[in-house]
Amino acid sequence: MRNTELVQWFRQSTPYVNMHREKTFVIMLDGNAIAHPNFINITNDIGLLHSLGIKLVIVFGARCQIDELLAKNQMSSTYHKHIRITDSKTLEVVKQAVGGLHYDIFSRLSLRLPNSPVLNVVSSNAVLAQPLGVIDGVDYGLSGKIRRINIEGIQQQLAQDAIVVIGPIAPSVTGEMFNLPFEEIATQIAIKLKADKLIGFCDQQGILDSEGNVLSDLHPREAKRYLTQFIESGQYHHSAARFLQAAIEACHAGIKRSHLLSYKEDGSLLQELFSRDGIGTQLSEESSENIRLATSFDIPGLLNLIRPLEEQGILVKRSREQLEMEISNYTIIERDGIVIACAALNHYPQEKMAEMACVAVHPDYRDSSRGDVLLEAIKRRAYKLQVEKLFVLTTRTTQWFQERGFVLSTTDDLPKEKREHYNYQRMSKILILDLGQ
């Protein structure tokens, strides 16, 4: 990374550093993630999150390590409804696998980067289990489910600046140990902690569409369709499928955002959390983007967006004072608290006309549909004002507006006030859209 790229990334990440401080994240790590060579980088990034004031709970699984140990001991186990049936001999193997991973996680988190503080990593026995029992005539043996979680205990450990680590085995009130799905543990802890995020590492960079592209944002309703596809194709054991189910449940229970990332790519955790667009798949009941009317609090963001375009001569220069006076005219698209697009609607009621002005989209989003989204929002505002004709003045984007129904016009077609202030030095093209009202 060149110095300029580093500086730019660092500046862009600053709002997210402030946004995430003092927040609580639950991180899900399956056995494949822990066994992967990139795990050392994941733990370094977890340590970085902790140093930024983020409260962390790590819940890990050991499915692949259990399978390896069973094969090594010439043993096997069966599944029913995607849950391992655990007898007493299998449980001993589970304990061995989980214990080894527990040690690996602690040792990795204890490996400090130069000049970084020692991390306070603690193990938690906050989960109390109970047997699954007999379902459909199948005895699950020592496979269990959650009976109770000592959330107060976890909260106390987090308040003491600890990273809390929880594995997939837990005791019952009778002292027996049970094997639990770690995804269930992570999901329920996130829900009961009222965590801000649930983050899952899987073997692909989130959820992919039919063409293999990462879906950056998913509503839980859409996510259910992808989960169904996993199940119908026999891929429920795929880590992405299990994490997707956990994320859907978490979103429905009030967790604002869940993220699915690849454990194979170095830095995926940081890229997902500290950049506008992330790198994996985010599940949320609400979109990370919001289109709304601007307020005075948006003026700094508006200035950051339009200043470069003013300097290039694409937009007419506007002072801060002018923006303050006209702020109610502006519609903005906001992404994670950052203004990425804007447009103003200037009304001329006598002529039943309005101007779409100061149209700006952040460079990172110009190849997307944000311009169309803004135009539709401006048209809706114009309809409410009973505007019959919407016009624009532009020096660079004539063709874009023509493709959307605007027709080239002359100054004679402008409202009287606008015609009197037309800048003949700038010689902007005039385009008008008949709204048909």
UniProtKB/Swiss-Prot annotation:
GO molecular function: L-glutamate N-acetyltransferase activity
Enzyme Commission number(s) of this protein: 2.3.1.1
CDD domains associated with the record: AAK_NAGS-ABP (cd04237), NAT_SF (cd04301)
Annotated SUPFAM superfamilies: Acyl-CoA N-acyltransferases (Nat), Carbamate kinase-like
Keyword tRNA processing: no
GO terms, biological process: L-arginine biosynthetic process
Cytoplasm recorded as keyword: yes
The reaction(s) this protein catalyses: L-glutamate + acetyl-CoA = N-acetyl-L-glutamate + CoA + H(+)
Organism of this sequence: Actinobacillus pleuropneumoniae serotype 5b (strain L20)
Main location: cytoplasm
Further facts: In bacteria which possess the bifunctional enzyme ornithine acetyltransferase/N-acetylglutamate synthase (ArgJ), ArgA fulfills an anaplerotic role.
Family the entry assigns: Belongs to the acetyltransferase family. ArgA subfamily.
InterPro entries xrefs: AceGlu_kinase-like_sf (IPR036393), Acyl_CoA_acyltransferase (IPR016181), Asp/Glu/Uridylate_kinase (IPR001048), GNAT_dom (IPR000182), NAGS_kin (IPR033719), NH2A_AcTrfase (IPR010167)
PROSITE patterns to which the protein is assigned, alphabetical: GNAT
Pathway where it operates: Amino-acid biosynthesis; L-arginine biosynthesis; N(2)-acetyl-L-ornithine from L-glutamate: step 1/4
Originating gene: argA
Protein name: Amino-acid acetyltransferase
Domain N-acetyltransferase: 289-429
Record's subcellular location: Cytoplasm
Enzyme class: transferase
An example Gene Ontology CC term for this record: cytoplasm
Gene3D superfamilies listed in its UniProt record: 3.40.630.30, Acetylglutamate kinase-like
Swiss-Prot/TrEMBL keywords: Acyltransferase, Amino-acid biosynthesis, Arginine biosynthesis, Cytoplasm, Transferase
